[in-house]
Structures are given as structure tokens and as C-alpha cells.
Amino acid sequence: MFLAAALLAACGGTPAPLTHEAYIWQRQWTPALRGSVAASRDFVAAWRVLAAQASRDGRVQVFTADNGALAAAGRPVIPVVRIDGRLARFDATALRAQVVGVLTRWPGAAAIEIDYDCPTARLPAYAAFLRELKPALGGTRLSITALPTWAGSADLDALLAIADESVLQVHAVQAPQAGLFDPAIAASWVSAYATHTHRPFRIALPTYGSRVSWNDDGTLLAVESETAALAAGASASELYASPDAVMAFVQGLEAHRPEGLAGIVWFRLPTPDDTRAWSLATWRGVVTGHLDRAPLRTRLRDAGQGASDVLVENPAATDAAAPSRVALPPGCMLADGIDGYRLAPGTQPLTLVAGQARPLAAHATRAVGWARCPPGTPTTLTLQGTPVS
């Protein structure tokens, strides 16, 4: 975090506190989603809601939001139109009509956002599209998302001059091998980006994890961040945005704030149904700068017939990264891992190691394996480390 702070320190002073907004990316408005909107309205300044999506083949899908739930939350709403960065044919006229159509369905919108992760070489064409789109918005503010890789282009400044504001994405930008979020790299991206824009900008930060699946030859098969693990590759790993690392990054931004930085946009609003996102309590803790922490506990639980379940417990009110290793007591003769854990070969004492282990939710107990140990074996185990986010 020292490198992050150093990189950001050169960017400016310390104006008013950063505001916190959230993306609502869920397609279905479930009771859990409505509950999350209501529960977080006290610290969320605005909602950015997925309103439409243009897929790779050009088809546009429009999503229906719960306007009642949004109105009850009493915060500004910004509909987002997502355009697939791999779009085969960019029909500017048709897309412009779709964006204007979305805006007519959101008459009270505080702005409209275009989320288009286009290749850097297409920035001039994208700028031309935005230049023609803006007059059609009738005075509604225009926001766009941006990628750190664009900072190396001479065309970026012209693009950013068109939009009223932008949102820089600093999560899940690199290859999956690099993880979801690296604070030092993100800080360097923010520092570079701030030199290209003279309009307000925000930073998109993650509240989620991803499961990455690989083929036998080591090539990437799938990255699953919003759905259950469906891909069946030869191997898989769980990536996790550490709440502690993200909170420290935000605190660094607040202490050494780049000029023009208006706030944070969190991707995405956590709900109890979202098994790949932080809990609401964890997200609130990161935003407020106070994470409730307590050491994880491990123990054996009698499972009958001489076997025991290996349990890991999180007594804290916020999520915790799963331990990277769980060492069983000396004398245990057989063991194996479950739910993302496996038995490390040739270890004494027998040790379970994490491969795909998911974060441990607040106040949760999870079985991570089983063991056969002699009667009277101590039930307290040894755990260490956390996976790298």
C-alpha cells in the first residue's frame, strides 16, 4: 500500500470525502436485491443500473428495473447501456437509437452511462459515436466507462472531453493469472488516467470473486463472476478481491486524492443470493473503513464410525478469506479435502490445502475435509495464510 500511496500522492490535495455509488447488474429484481437496495441506501449516493445490453452479434436486450424500489431508496439513478467489446459490427445509428430509447424509459435519470470496453484502436470511432450521441440526449449528462489500457493512446483525451464524467475500471482488467485486483497496479493506472481527463471521474472497485477454469493445455476456459460454477475444465481456482486490500486502497485515495476524482462506484451491489459477492456487512465495513475481524477457528467434529469433519469457523461479522492450509493434529491417519480443499501429498502432519476455496461468510462454519484420528486427538487444528487476491 505504500507504493499505492506514493503514486497517488503526486496527484493533488484532499477535497470533500469520496462519494460511494453502486452498480446494480442483476437482471432479475428478486426480494434479496430489493432488500439490499433498501439496506444500503444510507451510504450509497447513486445507483447505476444495467438497463440494456448489446451482445456480440448486435442484438439488444432491455432489462426492466423495479422503479418502486429505486424510488423508495431516494437516490439518483443512472441507467447503463452495456455494449459488448467484441461487437462484430458497430452500427452507430442503430446503437444511438437504442441509447435514446433507453433514456426515454428512464425519464428521471440523473445521467446515462455507456459501458463499452472497446479495443484501444477503436477509440476514434467510439469518440465519433459519442460526439453524435450527446446532442440526442437532450441535456442529460453522459457518463462512460474506461479501461486503464486506453491511457497509452493519444486518442483518449479527445474521448474523455466528450463525456461529462467517466468511470475507470481497475478490477478484472488483466489476465486471470494476475488476480482480480492489485492495489499498486491500480494506483499507477489511476495516476496515469488522471492526467488525461479534465472532467470528474470515478473508480470502479470490486465486491466480488471469480472462479477461473482452465483446459488441460493450460489455456483459459471460463471466468465465472456472476453465476454458479458451470464450466468443467481440467482445473479451476477461486479469485477473491480482499476486503482489507480494497479498503486500504480506498483509504489511500482519500489521503492522497487525484485531481478530478469524485468517488467510487462498486461493482456490484451485494445481495444474499450472490454467492460470489461480499456480504452487505463486509461491503459496508469497507466503505466506512471499519471491518470487524476475529481469528478463524478450526476444529474436528465427530462424524461417526471413527471419522471426523474438519471445520473452519468465522466468528466475525464480516467475510474472511479461506485459510490456505489446515494442518491436522499429529496422529491422524487418513484425510481428504472437500469444497475447494485437497490433501497435500507427503505432509506430516496431514495437511489440507486450498485450491478453489471460497471466502468464508460472516458467522459461518464450513466443512473443508474429513479425517480419521485416534480417540482423544486434540480437536484444535492449525491454519495459516490466505489465498492471494
Task: Describe each model-derived feature in a short phrase.
Residues 302, 309-322, 328:
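Asparagine-centered strand-capping/turn motif at beta-strand->loop junctions
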